């Protein structure tokens, strides 16, 4: 078995997008802890390949990869939790959809991070 890929559809809860963007930009700024958070999430078996915002008020679509053995329930718990993309703000409603790579003869959306 190999790692798994997911498309995650994020919608902002009413009135939360500005605070979320402010928090995200602060985290990504030098010294904001972004690199450390990415490394910690990767160590736990979660890796975000891309984040794709449609507008500042959403939606945002992301491609995530999880290491082998992480269930969809565990992934959803991570995505909804304080170390996921919501920064613990309860700003996002997250719909996680697994990508069935077997339908595309094993083609993955990105090269695997977890082998």
Residue ranges and their predicted role:
Residues 1-59, 65-77, 96-115:
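Short S/T/G/P-rich N-terminal loop/turn motif that feeds into the first structured element of a domain
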Residues 79-90:
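A common structural junction motif
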